[in-house]
Amino acid sequence: MSTGTVVQVIGAVVDVEFPHDAVPQVYDALEIKSEGLVLEVQQQLGGGVVRTIAMGSSDGLRRGLEVVNSGSPITVPVGSATLGRIMNVLGEPVDEAGPIGEEDRYVIHREAPSYEDQSNTTELLETGIKVIDLVCPFAKGGKVGLFGGAGVGKTVNMMELINNIAKAHSGLSVFAGVGERTREGNDFYYEMEDSGVLDKVAMVYGQMNEPPGNRLRVALTGLTMAEKFRDEGKDVLFFVDNIYRYTLAGTEVSALLGRMPSAVGYQPTLAEEMGVLQERITSTKTGSITSVQAVYVPADDLTDPSPATTFAHLDATVVLSRNIASLGIYPAVDPLDSTSRQLDPQVVGQEHYDVANGVQTVLQRYKELKDIIAILGMDELSDEDKTTVFRARKIEKYLSQPFFVAEVFTGSPGKYVSLKDTIRGFKGILEGEFDHLPEQAFYMVGSIDEAVEKANKK
């Protein structure tokens, strides 16, 4: 193990000089023992100098400090010892519950599985959330993105998915908190503890207040832990909140390293960095990784390079809309914007496909009629269009659902709706079975039977 000295410190960027015959490789982990700080090599500048990014605060660093080369990239603990624990980007425990006691350590920079090793089976994963199961069904071993601007419910939706899937699925989960609020990480821990699934979840956090190096690598740390479970033949759920912060950390690091920015100030390597992470999130013939990723959409603009680059890697996209949230309909999923590769008659079956298509057709027609209604009023519509509008409004209301994780602030008990009940309910509305019921009866209920019961009470 060679040693070098710090020659320059500019924020999170630290330049280290090594003997010419012992220059570290790119991605090698270096350690400043006196400060307990790990650095990751990003560039070799020549003359024995390497440019690194600090995986922690660089406050108090000075020139001349001794740096030791570990000879390998950052390694993190993997395996069952990580379950129920909160770790940082280096796999160190931050939950004050003692050492991890790991059985094994993996490097965080690994190759994606080869195409031959990947699995291509399609099995649906029921979430219990009506709008998602109907219009953008998830596949086991697939990748799902939750897209939305600030404050439309990405984290709440993700928490509900974790609550529903992790409980019903009884598999293992890894949660990577990338550049999000510390409070959310704390809430998540207690949520898992209350649900009794804490011993099945490994948590890795790199919060908003941490240096860009941590936020850039914490997703890889979580993914490495998930890969270990997958390679042991288990089905793993991998949650990332928020993938946009991963991109943002890459932008910060890129600027610190002096690279020329590209469109909207993002790093020129945006597509490649996203690809490196996403290509590793895949299912093999041994086990599966089902990934759910929250994606912040800057200024609600889905064409922004960051969300646009993420779109390409996903099997299903759940788009959360501010307009729907403003109507008080939660989850604020836009059924016309959300998509899934699984919504195919050969995968979900003809009935499910026809009902989902019917719902989207009715909602699209209602959207077109809104302008006419605003100018001329409902009376100018044909009887057929009036029926479409009434059914569309019922569908809109019925797409709302009380969440288990939101019970505290809504006061309504959460509801899990099976796929069979979801299809039956929407099919009934489309066929006019419930035309006699008031639309308010469909708001914030679980199955269609509850809507009927609610209407009869009134």
Swiss-Prot record:
Gene3D superfamilies recorded: 2.40.10.170, Bovine Mitochondrial F1-atpase, Atp Synthase Beta Chain, Chain D, domain 3 (1.10.1140.10), P-loop containing nucleotide triphosphate hydrolases (3.40.50.300)
Presence of keyword Translocase: yes
Subcellular locations according to the entry: Cell inner membrane
Pfam families, alphabetized: ATP-synt_ab (PF00006), ATP-synt_ab_N (PF02874), ATP-synt_VA_C (PF22919)
GO MF: ATP binding; ATP hydrolysis activity; proton-transporting ATP synthase activity, rotational mechanism
Summary of subunit composition and partner proteins: F-type ATPases have 2 components, CF(1) - the catalytic core - and CF(0) - the membrane proton channel. CF(1) has five subunits: alpha(3), beta(3), gamma(1), delta(1), epsilon(1). CF(0) has three main subunits: a(1), b(2) and c(9-12). The alpha and beta chains form an alternating ring which encloses part of the gamma chain. CF(1) is attached to CF(0) by a central stalk formed by the gamma and epsilon chains, while a peripheral stalk is formed by the delta and b chains.
PROSITE patterns with a match to the protein in the record: ATPASE_ALPHA_BETA (PS00152)
Signal peptide residue numbers: none
Keyword terms of this UniProt record: ATP synthesis, ATP-binding, Cell inner membrane, Cell membrane, CF(1), Hydrogen ion transport, Ion transport, Membrane, Nucleotide-binding, Translocase, Transport
Principal location class: membrane
EC number: 7.1.2.2
Bilayer disposition of the protein: Peripheral membrane protein
Organism whose genome encodes this protein: Shewanella pealeana (strain ATCC 700345 / ANG-SQ1)
SMART domains (UniProt xref): AAA
Protein name: ATP synthase subunit beta
Enzyme class: translocase
Binding site for ATP: 148-155
Entry GO CC: plasma membrane; proton-transporting ATP synthase complex
Reactions catalysed according to its record: ATP + H2O + 4 H(+)(in) = ADP + phosphate + 5 H(+)(out)
Record's function text: Produces ATP from ADP in the presence of a proton gradient across the membrane. The catalytic sites are hosted primarily by the beta subunits.
Family: Belongs to the ATPase alpha/beta chains family.
